[in-house]
Amino acid sequence: MLNLLWLVVVLMVIAALLGFGGVVSSLQSVAWFLIVAAVVLAVVGFVTGRRAL
């Protein structure tokens, strides 16, 4: 559940930073969002798996 929450937060932050305001732009960038979110979650999982943050 916590990972899903982080996924939503990361996607919202990325969308805000990249300036995707429209639904069409977001739909065209779903693959990009998924790639970035997967990388971020992998890094967070790796760090939290090795260290207690």
Swiss-Prot record:
Question: InterPro entries given for it?
Answer: DUF1328
Keywords for the protein's UniProt record, in alphabetical order:
Cell membrane, Membrane, Transmembrane, Transmembrane helix
Keyword NADP attributed: no
Tell me where it resides.
Answer: Cell membrane
Transmembrane residue ranges: 4-24, 32-49
Q: Does the keyword Lipid metabolism apply?
A: no
Q: How does it sit in the membrane?
A: Multi-pass membrane protein
Q: Spell out the GO cellular component terms annotated for this protein, sorted alphabetically and separated by semicolons.
A: plasma membrane
- Predominant location category: membrane
Check the record and name the HAMAP family matching this protein: UPF0391
| UniProt record similarity statement | Belongs to the UPF0391 family.
**What's the protein called, per UniProt?**
UPF0391 membrane protein gsr2640
